[in-house]
């Protein structure tokens, strides 16, 4: 989702446009609008559902740039079940406690849509909010039966044996839906139109860089940092 941001930083696209960018990791996507509102962030990457909920709730946020897109070929996020849980399909999630990195955020909303499409009432699943770094420990400790997670956290969980991928449910989602958007306060964009434009242009250049197969190793290295 944020690969273009990492690449733009690593390849110097921000610096080329005289942007000083400090990347901050926000464990729960649902807290990004509040961080923008308090000026802890100038630009943040909420999921579309989190952004819309924030605007509907009265926050004066605007979009600066797009982000990642869904694809049936992407297996970078999915349902990761605790070892020994027996979860194999949507029906097995009924009555289970499942951690999601932000209630109402993209992974939570799309997972519920997948359950619905599979004939499962999401209200029969107990969802709890859990940040990505917590996922492995929550599975090991048995606090949750599964998590809706994403790489690199998902890969670390499976490699450690704490859990297994029960479904790459993202492969069932429609193509080319936004997974995250880059947003800012309207006031900040009005005062800094050049910076907002330079940020967007940097991501466009990074996206073009990522589309070239010869750059795959550099892209993976940038994301890994």
List each model region and its residues.
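Short, glycine-/small- and polar/acidic-enriched structural segments
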Residues: 1-131, 138, 145-152, 162, ...
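Pocket-lining segment of extracytoplasmic ligand-binding domains
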Residues: 133-224
